[in-house]
């Protein structure tokens, strides 16, 4: 798949967004900051990525996901947990960043902060029914299948 990308921050020309390995599902996104930013415990910030994308095809969407090391080692996760980018969005990608940890974290300019994953999308056509055909699970919700 080809992805139309606008580079909005000239520094990205030297460090184009890329997949870290041939098996990586996520394209690394960088913090396009002008200076280091201290993320205090409990604080949230919108961090620019310096790029915009246009998927154009309604059969695709993009997800902004946290980098596992940032969350596990430093408590830096996404403020919205997952960022959903619709196929018709054309603005700059922003990363909602939340320091859920108990110590301040310094985010440096051009540091890899999150990753972008392209996923297929199926838009459902609603079929209104009076009842569902019975299934083994039925309406059993949280924890209804037991611990394994």
From Swiss-Prot:
Report residues binding substrate. 67-69, 80, 84-86, 94
Give the keywords, sorted. Answer: Hydrolase, Magnesium, Metal-binding, Nucleotide metabolism
* CDD domains for this protein: trimeric_dUTPase (cd07557)
- EC class, as a word, reads hydrolase
User: Which reaction(s) does the protein catalyse, per the Swiss-Prot or TrEMBL entry?
Assistant: dUTP + H2O = dUMP + diphosphate + H(+)
The EC code for this enzyme is 3.6.1.23
Where does the source fall among the domains of life? Bacteria
Gene3D superfamilies per the UniProt record, alphabetical: 2.70.40.10
Named cofactor requirement(s): Mg(2+)
Q: Which GO terms describe its molecular function?
A: dUTP diphosphatase activity; magnesium ion binding
Q: In which pathway does it act?
A: Pyrimidine metabolism; dUMP biosynthesis; dUMP from dCTP (dUTP route): step 2/2
User: Could you give a single Gene Ontology term from the biological process aspect?
Assistant: dUMP biosynthetic process
Annotated family: Belongs to the dUTPase family.
What does this protein do, in the record's words?
A: This enzyme is involved in nucleotide metabolism: it produces dUMP, the immediate precursor of thymidine nucleotides and it decreases the intracellular concentration of dUTP so that uracil cannot be incorporated into DNA.
Q: What is this protein called?
A: Deoxyuridine 5'-triphosphate nucleotidohydrolase
**Taxonomic placement:** Bacteria, Pseudomonadati, Pseudomonadota, Betaproteobacteria, Burkholderiales
């Amino acid at each position: 798949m080809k992805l139309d990308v606008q580079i909005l921050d000239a520094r990205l020309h030297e460090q184009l967004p890329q997949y870290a390995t041939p098996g990586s599902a996520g394209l690394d996104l960088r913090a396009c900051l002008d200076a280091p930013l201290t993320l205090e415990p409990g604080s949230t910030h919108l961090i620019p990525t310096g790029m915009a994308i246009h998927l154009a095809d309604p059969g695709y969407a993009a997800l902004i996901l946290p980098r596992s090391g940032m969350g596990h080692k430093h408590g830096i996760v996404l403020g919205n947990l997952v960022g959903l980018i619709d196929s018709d969005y054309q603005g700059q990608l922003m990363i909602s960043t939340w320091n859920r940890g108990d110590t301040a974290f310094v985010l440096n300019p051009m540091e890899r902060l999150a990753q972008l994953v392209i996923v297929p999308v199926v838009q459902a056509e609603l079929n209104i029914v009076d009842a569902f055909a019975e299934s083994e699970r039925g309406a059993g919700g949280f924890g209804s299948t037991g611990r394994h």
